[in-house]
Every structure is written in C-alpha cells, then in structure tokens.
Amino acid sequence: MHSLEKVTFEDVAIDFTQEEWDMMDTSKRKLYRDVMLENISHLVSLGYQISKSYIILQLEQGKELWREGRVFLQDQNPDRESALKKKHMISMHPIIRKDASTSMTMENSLILEDPFEYNDSGEDCTHSSTITQCLLTHSGKKPCVSKQCGKSLRNLLSPKPRKQIHTKGKSYQCNLCEKAYTNCFYLRRHKMTHTGERPYACHLCGKAFTQCSHLRRHEKTHTGERPYKCHQCGKAFIQSFNLRRHERTHLGQKCYECDKSGKAFSQSSGFRGNKIIHIGEKPHACLLCGKAFSLSSDLR
C-alpha cells in the first residue's frame, strides 16, 4: 500500500457555484455536511492525515458555507470573473488521494445504485461501486455522467438528483422492511436501525451513534457548549432545532393542528401524543403490572 500523505480539500474538488448552492434546500445542505464529515471520518480511520481547512471547520460547526461571491461573479472582466468564481466555489468532494490503494473497501461509503460512466476511463460506476471507491482511481476533476440522459452528476446533492428524475419515485428500498427512500444515503442510515450499527463513538464516555451529526451534538453536552441563543430572553441551546421550538413560545405559534379535534400544538411531540389518544394506541406498558398507557409521562 502506498504511504498515506496529507490531504486537503483543494487536492481533488468537484465544486458547486453560488447559484447551485442557493437552489439546495436546508435538508440538502445538511446532507452535504453529514456526507462530507463522514467521508473525512473514513479517511482518518484509514490513516490519512486530514488538513483542517477553513471549510472543514465550518462544516464541523454547522455554519453556512456560502457568504461571498454574490456580487463579484457579475464582474465584467472575464479573467477576474473566472478567478473569483474559482475562489468562491464550494468543495463538494470526498478527500481521497489518486494513488491510494484501490483494494480498500469502505462499507460506510455512499453507494451509487444508478449506472454512471466515469469520464476518465469510461468505467461503469454501478450499484456495486461507491463514490469514494471510484474516485480512488481517478483525479476527481471530471464528474460522473448519467448514461440515461448524458447530464453530469456532480454528486448526490444536486438540486434534482438524476436518479430521481429518471424514475420519478423512491428508488432506494430496504430489503428487510421494504421501506423506500429517494436517496441512498437515507437508505444506508435506515439500515443501521436493523443491524444495530453505531459507528460513531464518543471518546469521552463511549456512547455510540448512527450519525456523526448526532455524535457532534452529544459532545456538546460534555463541553457545555450552547451556541444557539434566543435573542429575546437569552436562553441558550445545544441544538438549533430546540432554539426554533423555544422561539415559538415567544410568538405563540402552534404549527401542529389535529384534524380530528382541531387542537393545536407548538411542538410535534405534543401533537403525536394527542394523535395516539385518538386512535387508542397504548405503546407504553409497565414492566411490573403490564398496564399500558398512551403517553410515556402517564407511565412514569
């Protein structure tokens, strides 16, 4: 095996322009961060030295990656426009060296289940391959091309994934429970619920998680970090979701309304509890007497 040298984002990068980034919704951007950090974790486990660039630090902190370039890209000077556009591109590519061993297997890599042809050699990247495995033998500068429509697939985070356009449905199905997903990343994450796999472990307490984002969130409980602060009352939270939920208490918003009783709730947990009461489900059973309850609070 070749020696594993220091790798940076700039070595091999497939980029998104500002316009493409703007077209991605919040879930796609979150998926991008999770995928990139997972790929970084894989490379570290294989012995690569990862250079912590500005973009990686931004990823780990969950910050918005695009803050510049909106005005500069309209410059009339073609050379300056090209240089600035390149400067403000966003790296969207796993950090992998061209000379790495092709015999390495990455079970946790993203699996491509649509046939794509790689431009460098014309090899097929079918469902048995992975994005990272394919890129081990190429420079990463040329995108995969869909055989069905001939358009380039920069990666799974394109505003409209080519696979979904061709099939017009949920193309990735679990072979254990038949639950289907529009993205193979979500399918792989779902399969962990069947296997019990928890690849991301906290180095302080040993608690393990299925997603690296959950591990990062957990680590903040050790450090006491609460980066999300309410501007009205000053209360701080570990997760942005909890801050948004808290802000609804100031606004009096109740986003979840029961279609049977008309009762509204500010939190989805209260809405789900109300729904369980309507259908008569009692999922929380006492281990001592067997009596069951609709709400976990009633069991306690």
UniProtKB/Swiss-Prot annotation:
Keyword terms, alphabetized: DNA-binding, Metal-binding, Nucleus, Repeat, Transcription, Transcription regulation, Zinc, Zinc-finger
Domain KRAB, first and last residues per copy: 7-78
Magnesium in keyword set: no
Compartments in which it is found: Nucleus
SUPFAM superfamilies membership: beta-beta-alpha zinc fingers (SSF57667), KRAB domain (Kruppel-associated box) (SSF109640)
PROSITE patterns: KRAB, ZINC_FINGER_C2H2_1, ZINC_FINGER_C2H2_2
Zn finger limits (C2H2-type): 172-194, 200-222, 228-250, 256-278
Primary location group: nucleus
Task performed by this protein: May be involved in transcriptional regulation.
Xref: CDD domains: KRAB_A-box
Identification of the protein by name: Zinc finger protein 705D
GO cellular component, one term: nucleus
Domain of life where this protein originates: Eukaryota
